[in-house]
Amino acid sequence: MDIQMLGFLVFFGFMAAFIDSVVGGGGLISIPALLWTGLPPVTVLGTNKAAAVMGALTSFVAFVRSGRVDMWLIKRLFPLSLLGSGFGVLAVRMVPPDILRPLVVVMLIAVLVYSVLKKDWGRENHYAGLSARLLLLSCLVSFSFGFYDGFFGPGTGSFLLFAFLLVGFDFLGAAANARALNFASNISAAVLFTYFGLVDFSYAIPMGLAMIAGAWCGARMALSRGTGYVRPLFILMTTVLIGKQLVDLFK
């Protein structure tokens, strides 16, 4: 790999993780950058996951240290997201993931419309714990979005953040807890892609190191600027995701 390609991957890895560390959607930047290297598409996905898990760990640690992650809840949901993602990666080898694209577009539009119309939603933290019924539902949601992230992926960050908003977290708290579950699904996917020989570490390592820096800066920015920063970024990235999925749907 020449110095120009290295600089290219480092720059876009940093930018992808900076955004992904708060609201997700970093794959919109990192995957096209990796495709530019000429790697096969399936290896691009594996290499991206291997790099992204480094950034995901970094933002997870930053949010945990800030006290924004509800460890009682995450300890129960983390293993389910990990397990779901593993099943998702296995399923993608048997079923074409594009069958989900129309449903994903509809769901992302619903998330966007609701978030835009509810202007005061997520400004303050109203989370006061979960009933047994809501905890069971949260476990199911965690497994399902873990599976989705391993199987298809686009919009996982938006869906997870939205789910935490629904149970009462503010935007910053929702982003922090969503990052925790996204880290879990990234671990499982990265391990399995590596096992199947679908990771090119000559690209994954430099991009991953850049993602560590980007994720740390992104998480610190979110923590310092708060909910007023996270909400518009969430709306922007969800809008971009919808546009990207519509382009792919009608391509």
Task: Locate the predicted segments by residue.
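Selective hydrophobic functional segments
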Residues: 46-99, 106, 186-232, 236
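Residues within membrane-spanning alpha-helices of integral membrane proteins
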Residues: 6, 49, 104-108, 112, ...
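Residue-level signature of the transmembrane alpha-helical core
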Residues: 10, 14, 18, 49, ...
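Hydrophobic alpha-helical transmembrane segments in multi-pass integral membrane proteins
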Residues: 144-154, 189, 194, 241-251
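Selected transmembrane alpha-helices and immediately adjacent juxtamembrane segments
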Residues: 1-40, 125-175, 205
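Helix-loop junctions at the membrane-solvent interface of multi-pass transporters
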Residues: 22, 65, 94-95, 117-118, ...
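Transmembrane helix exit motif
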Residues: 57-68, 105-130, 240-251
